[in-house]
A protein has these predicted regions:
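Exposed beta-strand-loop-beta-strand "reactive/processing" segments of non-cytosolic proteins
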Residues: 114-163, 214-259
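Structured segments of extracytoplasmic/periplasmic soluble domains
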Residues: 108-116, 142-146, 198, 202-206
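Long, charged/polar, surface-exposed segments that mediate recognition or autoinhibition
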Residues: 88-100, 156, 160-215
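Short, low-complexity, Pro/Ser/Thr/Gly-rich segments in the mature regions of secreted, periplasmic
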Residues: 254-276
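N-terminal, intrinsically disordered, polar/charged segments of Gram-positive cell-envelope systems
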Residues: 2, 30-115
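Sec-dependent N-terminal signal peptides of Gram-positive bacterial secreted proteins and lipoproteins
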Residues: 1-35
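A eukaryote-biased signal for long
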Residues: 14-17, 73-78, 239
Length: 276
């Protein structure tokens, strides 16, 4: 069990370290993790790494209903171009949110957490019924303000429960226009106070945890493209954990992984170990 605990800790740290680029390939990340786990388990078997591709349909959502607001939710409607991602798409079931509903839920999370206005944005959606390392059906959104998508594009991404719309993770990815060191900063492991305070402020501002915050702990460091990152864990008095990522270059908030997402991943790993 000691070996597994070490492995799980490393995988969770890897998840946090690569969090800033999860939106560029959420499904690819989980698929790669499955390949690694299968190799580590000594199994010679195929695991899902690709998904069916269907034709891309594109539509622009209506701007207004009454007084510029949606009649049911009261939220302001905006124009953004919505497409099913041609690179990766599954087939949602009757109980899943539609692509349009999932996109609206994602847009609300982006407004609430990043204060992002999607007017004029391009939103690419992907549906996945779940993977070995994340066995929950989910919708993933990739949001840009340019039609062409490249690894260097500035983007906001999210992953939500396909049925309930609950947030699993959300992130912001950018390419810096300056060259900065990407190496490990040992001092931050002992003192990440500036990031801990930023995490506390964001958690309280967005009411991300039910109840009070118990403590904030250093998690790991990494980088996304040419942007050095640091992740910290915000731990609530009820045991809830939110993993947050920031830029080590200018302390910009880069996103978060929710407690539900963490529990889904850990449960999947526990089940995999139990089958060994």
């Amino acid at each position: 069990m000691k070996n597994f605990n070490t492995k799980r800790k490393n995988i969770l740290k890897l998840t946090a370290a690569t969090f800033a680029i999860i939106g560029v390939g959420t499904i690819l990340f989980h698929s790669a993790a499955e390949v690694v786990l299968a190799a580590n388990n000594g199994k010679v078997e195929k695991v899902p790494t690709t998904y069916q591709v269907s034709g891309s349909s594109e539509t622009t959502l209506p701007k207004v209903t009454e007084n510029g607001k949606d009649k049911e939710s009261g939220s302001v409607k905006v124009n953004y171009t919505l497409s099913m991602d041609s690179m990766n798409t599954g087939t949602p079931t009757d109980t899943d949110l539609t692509m349009e509903e999932a996109a609206e839920a994602g847009a609300q999370y982006l407004r609430d957490i990043f204060v992002l206005d999607l007017e004029g944005a391009y939103v690419y959606m992907s549906y996945n019924p779940g993977t070995v390392t994340f066995p929950r059906a989910f919708w993933a959104g990739d949001v840009l303000f340019q039609k062409e998508r490249t690894p260097e594009s500035t983007r906001w991404t999210y992953m939500i429960d396909a049925v309930t719309g609950e947030l699993f993770n959300i992130s912001y990815d950018r390419q810096l226009d300056v060259s900065v060191p990407l190496g490990y900063d040992a001092a931050l492991e002992d003192d990440c106070g500036i990031y801990a305070q930023s995490a506390r402020n964001k958690t309280e501002e967005c009411k991300l945890i039910d109840g009070s915050i118990d403590r904030i702990e250093y998690n790991c460091q990494g980088y996304s493209g040419n942007d050095p990152t640091i992740s910290v864990d915000v731990i609530g008095g009820n045991g809830e954990i939110i993993n947050m990522s920031f830029s080590r270059y200018d302390q910009t908030f880069l996103g978060l992984i929710t407690d539900t997402s963490r529990k889904v991943t850990e449960s999947a790993l526990d089940n995999m170990v139990g089958e060994m």
